[in-house]
Amino acid sequence: MIETARVRIGNQTALSAYSVMQPFEYAVANGFDAFEWFPDKNESGAGWDENDISKEARLLIRDTATAHDIRLSVHAPWQLNPLRSETLEHLSKTIRFAQDTGASLVNVHLYADEGIAAFVDAIVPLKKRLAHDGIKLAIENTPNTGPEDFNKLFSLLRLTDNPPLVGMCLDIGHANLCKATRNDYLKFIDMLDPQVPVIHIHMHENYGDNDSHLPLFTGPAGKDPTGIRGLIERMKNRNFSGCIILEQWPHPESLLVEIRTRLLKIIG
């Protein structure tokens, strides 16, 4: 059974927030024990990237997180594909940001367009750099990657990854959009090999139509939370002990506290 103290719930930076720091400050003020930094600057200049946060600000983030027992993670920009050499310089910036802020995990998307074996080879330098600083690497499912991709990914990683340095970030909203499990993210989980280590969770909802990132309990689970209960039960069976990140900045922001309260009640 999950020990509540081992499961942390937090929020994430957001393009729609008033400032880069606003969601983090909200997490601190409201007692969240996890937080994720997601550099999301787009072509129009909206959002933020690693260059926008100074060395001094990074140290303040690290010290604040330590003082408030907040576990930090960093979500690499979605377009950073380890298979593409032109993205490696930016990926290094993301790693430095994680190191400077004391983050315990870096999250990247799984890109399977050149095959799973090619992706495994591509992340070798990344996982070695992170392991040097005790930082875990989480590989996230996208709407285009399914359970079988992750079963193959971790069967290959088990051949070279001992002790394990890499785990899965289970994105519930993306699992709900996966072609093989559309509108049935529990089926996605059930199709995962029991040996796939889920170490991080991204939590948001949709109706199977697009990646709308609805706050938890405002989409299908608002009418029937059975799916969320099933998710938590499955994570208990897997001895999940990582962070659950609420991937939205809702209005009002107090929805985040309400979501956390309901989740903790379900976790028990």
Predicted regions and their residues:
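Histidine-acidic metal/acid-base catalytic patches
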Residues: 1-8, 17, 21-28, 92-96, ...
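N-terminal pre-domain/capping segments
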Residues: 1-92, 99, 167, 268
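Active-site beta-loop-alpha junctions enriched in small/polar residues
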Residues: 12-16, 38-42, 77-79, 111-113, ...
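Residue-level detector of anion-binding/catalytic polar loops
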Residues: 33, 71, 104, 136, ...
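Hydrophobic residues within beta-strands of alpha/beta enzymes
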Residues: 35-36, 106, 137, 201, ...
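Catalytic-core regions built around general acid/base machinery
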Residues: 52-69, 122-129, 156, 188-191, ...
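Active-site acidic/histidine proton-transfer and metal-coordination neighborhood
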Residues: 64-68, 79-170
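Short, basic/glycine-rich phosphate-binding loops at helix/coil junctions
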Residues: 71-74, 102-105, 208
